[in-house]
Design a protein with these regions (language model features):
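N-terminal export leaders
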Residues: 6-10
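Short boundary/loop segments of OB/S1/cold-shock single-stranded nucleic-acid-binding domains
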Residues: 22-35
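Conserved hydrophobic positions within beta-strands
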Residues: 40-42
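Short aromatic-glycine-enriched beta-strand elements
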Residues: 48-57
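Short nucleic-acid-contacting surface segments enriched for D/E, G, S/T with interspersed K/R
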Residues: 75-90
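OB-fold/S1-family single-stranded nucleic acid-binding modules
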Residues: 97-118
């Protein structure tokens, strides 16, 4: 790789990296002044990076909930089986400001046990 090509590649990589990190880790889109709780059956779940996710319904509204990364979930004792479809849980979180069906979850209650995710 020539010196100019290498510098161009490194400059481009450095310029794009912060944007990708901000897009992934930005929680600024969630309104922490409007917390809420939902209890119900899990309809769908994913246990994979970058974040685990579950879908539930409450009062006829379909919700998409963003949980913690799998490594943090496992560190707190939550496995894929505990958030499998058909399981009942309670979530406490904050709604997304521009996506009315999405929320970031702060903690879950599974089998009567409160588990912090952040």
């Amino acid at each position: 790789m020539t010196s100019i090509t290498r510098r161009l590649f490194l400059s481009l990589a450095a310029a794009l990296a912060p944007g990708a990190a901000a897009a992934h880790h930005g929680w600024g889109g969630y309104d922490t002044s409007k917390s809420f709780t939902v209890t119900g059956k899990i309809l769908k779940s994913t246990f994979e990076n970058p974040h685990c996710e579950i879908e539930m319904e409450d009062g006829g509204k379909h919700w998409h909930f963003v949980l913690a990364p799998p490594s943090r979930m496992q560190a707190r004792g939550i496995t894929a089986d505990l958030i499998a479809p058909g399981k009942t849980c309670t979530v406490f979180g904050y709604p997304h400001m521009s996506k009315p069906d999405e929320a970031r979850i702060e903690y879950v209650i599974l089998d009567g046990k409160r588990i912090e995710l952040r």
